[in-house]
């Protein structure tokens, strides 16, 4: 069943890539709500299902009624939970656990990404940067590993969307990266909240150095710095301070030796991290070689 829904989501994502029809987009949004309800009904997360259904269908109605370009863009941002419009996310994730939470943070957002790319307006660029700062400030007041991971994932998704705006080719790369990575990680999540103190989850969702999320930030900032400004320097400072919030998690993972938390998959640990690094090196080396070839062509 899970494999079928994964293939179905990939199909919906490809469909949104190749169409700009509002009714088709709305139909995909509706189908994603149905997929989430079908996946959640066996987990007993009825509060999260109800909150998600009400929020998504209300915003879907607004998406059809308010047929204004920029307003539709903000509505889709709110539907996905892009910061700073992520205020409703905790009302859903509070009752989600295990792989279902991973699905909500990754696969559930994928079909919305092509719509955001097509509706993007440059005037909304700084809203994404403001949302990233909101996530960094919010990390200082959160309690619990689960909430920190949700906010970290939300912040990472903002960077992913910004990367897609700067290069459409990155959309395809990141799409396949998330699909392959979640195929490795999702089947191995355990019972309730203990699984969120694993090294595998830490690597993927906390943007550790030399992971894909880390490189995404570096390349986005290299493009954004062309705009120049003190706000971007402030954003870099907040990125550093946010890592201090994760230090408690890192210390706990290093010193705890409890049986119920000692379920890290060491083989997966040594497989996922090299894949992340090698995929980034290969992808961006190809881009660099293409740019060098173009430069040589123009010099000739």
Curated annotation (Swiss-Prot):
According to its UniProt record, which reaction does this protein catalyse? Answer: a ubiquinone + NADH + 5 H(+)(in) = a ubiquinol + NAD(+) + 4 H(+)(out)
The transmembrane segments are 4-24, 29-49, 58-78, 87-107, 122-142, 165-185, 201-221, 231-251, 267-287
The annotated topology with respect to the bilayer is: Multi-pass membrane protein
Q: Where in the cell is it found?
A: Mitochondrion inner membrane
GO cellular component terms, alphabetically, are: mitochondrial inner membrane
Q: A GO molecular-function term, please? A: NADH dehydrogenase (ubiquinone) activity
- Write the protein's name: NADH-ubiquinone oxidoreductase chain 2
Upper classification of the organism? Eukaryota, Metazoa, Ecdysozoa, Nematoda, Chromadorea
Point out the gene that encodes the protein.
Answer: ND2
